[in-house]
A protein has these predicted regions:
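Hydrophobic/aromatic anchor residues within beta-strands of the central parallel beta-sheet
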Residues: 26, 47-48, 106
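Class I S-adenosyl-L-methionine
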Residues: 55-65, 70-169
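A generic structural signal for ordered secondary structure
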Residues: 8, 14, 47-49, 118, ...
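S-adenosyl-L-methionine-dependent DNA methyltransferase catalytic core
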Residues: 1-27, 31, 35-40, 62, ...
Length: 169
């Protein structure tokens, strides 16, 4: 399975998807210099599409799985929670990518505060595009991290594409 990654960061979400679903990273989209350097070192030959707001998705090879940890600042309890009014509100660009690429599976990650601001819009947009979504909150400490920050994970499947082994998701 081919995996595409938006807002890749240091690649943790991509690695988790590779381990769970199988497959290889086909491309990623990241602009932070330090993260780009690490991603390039760990994924030689895998192209970086750069700034998601400038990508022409009609020119990008489709993938089976699309991952994305889009910016949390618009939704975070630690910030001003401006939602759609925040210049870092980039969910609409993720939606454009999903609609153009039509991956079988979409895996998204964000802060728990997103549940009370903007989350309904994300789920409604996924549904409009023909995806069935499941979500849950996981504390970082549940995965062995030394802190308990909670993150929301959304797994969305194109209608009819859900894998039998993923019935618990």
């Amino acid at each position: 399975m081919r995996i595409g990654s938006l807002f890749s960061g240091y690649g943790g979400l991509d690695m988790a998807c590779q381990q769970y679903f199988g497959g290889e990273l086909a491309w990623y989209s990241e602009i932070e210099p330090a993260a780009c350097k690490i991603l390039a070192a760990h994924n030689p030959g895998v192209p970086n599409l750069g700034d998601i707001t400038k990508v022409n998705w009609a020119e990008v090879e489709p993938v089976d799985i699309l991952t994305g940890g889009y910016p949390c600042q618009p939704f975070s309890q630690a910030g001003q929670r401006k939602g759609k009014e925040d210049e870092r509100h980039l969910w609409p660009f993720v939606a454009v990518a999903i609609d153009a690429l039509r991956p079988r599976i979409v895996v998204l990650e964000n802060v728990r505060g997103h549940l009370t601001l903007g989350f309904g819009d994300v789920i409604a947009e996924l549904s409009r595009m023909g995806y069935d979504a499941r979500w849950g909150v996981v504390r970082a400490s549940d995965a062995g991290a030394p802190h308990g920050r909670a993150r929301i994970f959304i797994v969305a499947y194109l209608a009819g594409e859900r894998l039998a082994r993923d019935a618990a998701l």
